[in-house]
């Protein structure tokens, strides 16, 4: 028991002892209290503040046994001796039929009423004390809110276990600010400067509105078997659309998470490869150059990793050829122990990661890894400062008039669906927003906090995208879908970013795997841990898929936009709009304008998906 709690209880005891008139009354107070004035206590409950075995007293002759509470008639009152004034009656006892005020006063003197009132307060106080902030026991399929919190330790929360608006806002911001941040300059280049910024802000508004529908939907349910305070969006879909709605929500939520695992694996392989290359090169005697600097296209410490002819040949075909060449040894085939043979970006490094990280995926509880959630906030801050420092170093390099200039900027581009698809996943928080807001100290501020969170995310995306785009000193077509690839491995700031992000992603990946298995296994088996064998099999399959993408299709931007457009169609556009229409129709508040507007949201999602394969 914490010291402050012991001191508080002792002070309460001293206060109540002062109000107990004599030893006899003190013994009476030690017996079991009535449940009429207490909070849901049976006849078998005992006061936890008293001794386990209170002394038993024999009842007075002809009186009511102490410790037993039964109604007495008016005819029996006169037969009770005078010492019966010390016997206990139910709290808030007002007498039965035929009792006059004089009889009631004879049963309860002023001292007795005061004493029993104090004991009732004591009993209620200790039954209402919160044992640590966990007011409700959540079912297994509901994710713990601290999974997304930026507070690394429970001690940083208040005594109620709740979090304020500032922590809630930054938890929303931290959850959305993911890997798509690295692809934002590339996505902006695909859409053009002006059109891209318009799409960024428009998608933020649409995704915020559908997320708002998600957080309001449990409140409008009337027949939900799960408590609305604990309901997930899949429960809402099940209530309105049956099992099909629940399975759609779960399946596409899992698809988003699997897409996140794949992108994480591609990026971790990239970061580990370049970090290892720098370490190896620095250990060589008389090393003055770093291999990636042989490109010789450095301008303002930025280089073009691929030629601008990337649209002339199928990109997947070129990458497949490169991956096979790397696994066969490439030009270093004559040297069987060459570092370049055993350290390849699309061959060996993703496999090394699989062996190194597989044990971390099989923990039953990921609580330990939630302590590192704050690293996400630090990494985002570092990237913001990193990009801003490059703007100061390189300056603004934009030319709106000369198409032949290397600084020429397109205001609009036909490849804008790459940006809209990426943003659908970038602004995706719909499967976690209810969990995050469940710990909110002031639920009435949920809409405000969600809107502020989306504004912060939109600002960061626009800032990263525009700043890097404006400062890029060569052709914009050279911008990589991971903008750290535009910096040599010898660049100190970019190398630090790679190493820091690698560690941060290693701590987040087990959380993603936990979310995948929790939602998937609960939908199939009704429990989040159906056995170690099933968990291991699922993790092996997921890692195999991730390694395959990292080897044969390591395109972060393309993976983001395809996963975002497919899963976003269902979870961001269709399901929230259909839930709103269904609930408004049941409440009688659905107007034709509202109906067509929400159907329009679904149409936007369909068009976004089709455009990924057309343009």
UniProtKB/Swiss-Prot annotation:
Disulfide bonds join 304-478. The keyword Transferase does not apply. The chain crosses the membrane at residues 166-186, 193-213, 247-273, 342-358, 368-392, 414-434, 452-472, 492-512, 534-554, 562-582, 595-615. Coiled coil: none annotated. Amino acid transport is sodium-dependent. Transport of leucine, tyrosine and phenylalanine is increased by arginine binding. One of its GO terms (biological process) is amino acid transmembrane transport. Belongs to the amino acid/polyamine transporter 2 family. SLC38A9 subfamily. This is Sodium-coupled neutral amino acid transporter 9 homolog. It comes from Caenorhabditis elegans. The lineage of its organism: Eukaryota, Metazoa, Ecdysozoa, Nematoda, Chromadorea.
């Amino acid at each position: 028991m914490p010291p402050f709690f012991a001191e508080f209880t002792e002070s309460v005891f001293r206060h109540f002892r002062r109000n107990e008139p004599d030893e006899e009354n003190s013994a009476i107070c030690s017996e079991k209290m009535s449940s009429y004035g207490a909070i849901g206590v049976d006849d078998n409950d005992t006061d936890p503040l008293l001794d386990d075995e209170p002394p038993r007293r024999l009842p007075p002759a002809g009186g009511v046994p102490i410790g037993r509470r039964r109604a007495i008639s008016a005819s029996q009152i006169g037969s009770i001796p005078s010492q019966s004034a010390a016997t206990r009656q139910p709290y808030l006892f007002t007498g039965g039929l035929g009792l006059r005020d004089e009889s009631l006063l004879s049963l309860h003197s002023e001292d007795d009423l005061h004493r029993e009132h104090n004991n009732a307060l004591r009993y209620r106080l200790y039954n209402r004390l919160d044992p640590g902030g966990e007011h409700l026991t959540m079912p297994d399929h509901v994710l713990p809110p601290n999974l997304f919190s930026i507070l690394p330790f429970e001690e940083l929360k208040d005594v109620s276990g709740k979090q304020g608006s500032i922590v809630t806002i930054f938890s929303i911001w931290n959850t959305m600010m993911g890997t798509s941040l690295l692809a934002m300059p590339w996505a902006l280049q695909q859409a053009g400067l002006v059109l891209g910024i318009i799409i960024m802000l428009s998608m933020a508004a649409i995704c915020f509105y559908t997320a708002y529908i998600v957080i309001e939907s449990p409140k409008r349910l009337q027949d939900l078997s799960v408590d609305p305070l604990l309901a997930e969006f899949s429960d809402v879909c099940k209530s309105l659309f049956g099992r099909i709605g629940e399975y759609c929500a779960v399946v596409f939520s899992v698809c988003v998470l699997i897409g996140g695992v794949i992108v994480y694996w591609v990026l971790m392989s990239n970061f580990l490869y370049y970090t290892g290359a720098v370490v190896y090169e620095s250990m060589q005697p008389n090393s003055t150059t770093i291999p990636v600097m042989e490109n010789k296209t450095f301008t303002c410490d930025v280089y073009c990793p691929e030629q601008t002819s990337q649209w002339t040949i199928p990109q997947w075909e070129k990458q497949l050829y490169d991956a096979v060449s790397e696994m066969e040894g490439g030009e270093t085939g004559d040297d069987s122990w060459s570092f370049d043979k055993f350290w390849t970006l699309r061959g060996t490094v993703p496999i090394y990661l699989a062996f190194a990280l597989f044990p971390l995926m099989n923990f039953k509880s990921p609580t330990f890894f939630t302590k590192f959630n704050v690293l996400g906030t630090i990494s985002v801050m570092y990237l913001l400062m990193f990009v801003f420092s490059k703007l100061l170093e390189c300056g603004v390099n934009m030319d709106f008039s000369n198409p032949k200039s290397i600084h020429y900027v397109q205001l609009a581009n036909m490849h804008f669906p790459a940006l809209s698809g990426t943003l659908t996943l970038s602004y995706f928080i719909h499967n976690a927003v209810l969990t995050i807001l469940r710990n909110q100290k002031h639920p009435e501020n949920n809409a405000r906090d969600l809107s502020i969170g989306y504004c912060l995310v939109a600002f960061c995306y626009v800032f990263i995208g525009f700043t890097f785009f404006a400062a890029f000193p060569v052709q914009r077509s050279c911008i990589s879908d991971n903008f750290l690839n535009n910096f040599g491995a010898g660049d100190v700031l970019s190398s630090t970013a790679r190493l820091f992000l690698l560690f941060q992603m290693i701590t987040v990946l087990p959380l993603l795997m936990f979310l995948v298995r929790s939602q998937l296994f609960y939908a199939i088996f009704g429990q989040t841990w159906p056995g170690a064998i099933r968990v291991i099999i699922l993790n092996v399959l997921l890692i195999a898929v991730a390694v395959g993408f990292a080897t044969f299709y390591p395109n972060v931007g393309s993976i983001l936009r395809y996963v975002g457009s497919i899963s976003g169609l269902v979870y961001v556009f269709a399901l929230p709009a259909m839930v709103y229409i269904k609930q408004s129709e049941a409440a009688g508040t659905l107007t034709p304008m509202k109906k067509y507007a929400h159907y329009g949201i679904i149409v936007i999602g369909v068009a976004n998906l089709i455009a990924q394969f057309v343009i």
